[in-house]
Amino acid sequence: MCKKIIWLTIGKIVAPQGLSGKVRINPSSDFPERFIKSGDRWLQYDNEEPQKIQLNSGRQIPGKSIYVVEFQGIDDREKAKALVGKKLLIDSSHRPTLAPGEFHLLDLLGLKVRLKNDHREIGEVTNLTSAGNDLLEVRLLSGKKVLVPFVKEIVPEIKLQEGWLMVCPPPGLFDL
């Protein structure tokens, strides 16, 4: 039986860097080793099938969140330009080991959402979005979808083993 690969987007190629084929990546991952350590990665444009590529090396630009990486076979600026707009992916089975109490954002998908004041279930986490801060997309029991900022003040409790998380929404968050 074939296991279905779940792809994690870890960044997006935003520009070529110099003349030797390096590219700039805007990361969507908190794990720097994904952009620095050599090894297999995958590139995807829109809904195309991911294509395997070897990351040779990478470094973070000092004072910025951008990484500059070098891929095998990408050895000039024109080849680097052709990669702009592609997403950088990894297989979700290659997630870093975490300390106790930590979790991967992907683990939040499918969790039931409960209100802090009365523990009533109001919906389920259906997607994750990174827009400066991480946002949880929650499908309410009514069918409506809302974005919930993933910050400790609004999501104070997460029980992965029990399959739920608690929200303490500010007034009006679910009324829009």
From Swiss-Prot:
Top-level taxon of the source organism: Bacteria
Stretches that traverse the bilayer: none
Compartments reported by the entry: Cytoplasm
Assembly description: Binds ribosomal protein uS19.
Disulfide topology: none
Domain PRC barrel: 100-173
Name listed for the protein in its UniProt record: Ribosome maturation factor RimM
Record note on domains: The PRC barrel domain binds ribosomal protein uS19.
GO biological process, one term: rRNA processing
Similarity section: Belongs to the RimM family.
Gene Ontology molecular functions: ribosome binding
This protein's encoding gene: rimM
Function: An accessory protein needed during the final step in the assembly of 30S ribosomal subunit, possibly for assembly of the head region. Essential for efficient processing of 16S rRNA. May be needed both before and after RbfA during the maturation of 16S rRNA. It has affinity for free ribosomal 30S subunits but not for 70S ribosomes.
